[in-house]
């Protein structure tokens, strides 16, 4: 069914790139579609699945970026935004596939060489540094000026929002290379933290693609769970959140008729009776929801990791707790302080 609707529904592309890949691997969701039995977490045999992220990135992101790149001299701030979006998209690709064509993608040569991930990441840092420098200078010179406000469905032209997102993205990438190149990781993390505009800190800084005022829109997870009817929440995240009696469960999941939260175990072969069960919870979402790119809670957790490695343990604990508080407040959930203070609860049964 899904292979027939990929071109019709953007959500189907999202499904094979995100929901049937990272979400399942992490235990956030689990498959209930019985026709997926030959194509699950342990046996991804369909090329339309494992090629999807690669193809989508180059045909949708890189092709658009290549049209903007020649305008860098005339519209440096606009291309800086494009550079940030490119890195945000492509770091997922290299983390999935390893070496990718990247260093010479604007050369016009159709036979691009595959660059080692180390070189790709260093280019990411160079591009983010240049984009952040360009936008910071623009913001400091014209603090109230919007950039592409009529077209920006992420930050509505708010330049400081893009800078905070780029700084936080830089910090994320820095912490990802810490085991490969600790010196580079520390250098890039410090640069992200030290930028005068700063990192994402609260709900106002959320990086998410908003539903446009006009035109068609669909929220992929809603389509996957309520229209395609292909997945439910994962047993892994459910076990942790049930065990910790996490007050955010109702924000993330829809309770069953019994008022409980139950998820799908990773890698199972679903049967018809299992797929039709009313005892499995769905993701709590609507078709009008925004598509999340990055949360401010992640920024606090990354800052905590930085402090744990190169700063003080007390600051690490402070930032980690602030990450939890920010997650709660962003979702509109209460009970963060009790959740942080608890030292007795453990993950539930899987």
Predicted regions and their residues:
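Structured, solvent-exposed acidic/aromatic patches
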Residues: 29-85, 89-335, 343, 347-349
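Acidic, Ser/Thr/Pro-rich intrinsically disordered transcriptional activation regions
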Residues: 9-24
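Short, small-residue-biased leader/transition segments that mark boundaries at the very start
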Residues: 3-5
């Amino acid at each position: 069914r899904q292979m027939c609707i990929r071109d019709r529904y953007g959500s189907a592309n999202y499904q094979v790139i995100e929901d049937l890949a990272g979400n399942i691997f992490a235990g956030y969701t689990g498959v209930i579609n019985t026709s997926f039995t030959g194509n699950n977490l342990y046996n991804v045999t369909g090329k339309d699945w494992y090629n999807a992220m690669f193809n989508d990135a180059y045909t949708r992101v890189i092709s658009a970026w290549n049209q903007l790149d020649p305008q860098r001299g005339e519209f440096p701030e606009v291309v800086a935004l494009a550079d940030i979006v490119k890195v945000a998209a492509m770091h997922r690709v290299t983390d999935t596939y390893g070496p990718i064509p990247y260093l010479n993608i604007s050369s016009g040569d159709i036979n691009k060489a595959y660059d080692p991930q180390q070189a790709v990441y260093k280019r990411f840092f160079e591009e983010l540094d240049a984009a952040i420098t360009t936008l910071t200078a623009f913001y400091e010179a014209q603090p109230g000026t919007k950039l592409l406000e009529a077209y920006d469905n992420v930050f509505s032209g708010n330049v400081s929002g893009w800078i905070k997102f780029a700084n936080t993205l830089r910090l994320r990438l820095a912490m990802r290379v810490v085991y490969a190149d600790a010196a580079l990781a520390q250098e890039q993390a410090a640069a992200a933290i030290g930028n005068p505009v700063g990192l994402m800190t609260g709900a106002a800084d959320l990086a998410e693609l908003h539903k446009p005022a006009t035109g068609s829109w669909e929220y992929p997870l809603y389509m996957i769970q309520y229209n395609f009817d292909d997945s439910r929440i994962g047993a892994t995240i459910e076990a942790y959140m049930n065990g910790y009696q996490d007050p955010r469960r109702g924000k993330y999941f829809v309770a069953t008729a019994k008022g409980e939260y139950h998820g799908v175990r990773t890698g199972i072969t679903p049967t018809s009776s299992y797929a039709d069960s009313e005892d499995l919870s769905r993701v709590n979402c609507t078709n009008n929801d925004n598509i999340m790119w990055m949360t401010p809670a992640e920024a606090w957790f990354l800052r905590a990791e930085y402090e744990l490695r190169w700063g003080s343990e007390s600051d690490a604990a402070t930032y980690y707790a602030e990450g939890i508080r920010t997650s709660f407040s962003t979702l509109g959930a209460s009970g963060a302080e009790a959740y942080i203070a608890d030292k007795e609860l453990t993950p539930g049964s899987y």
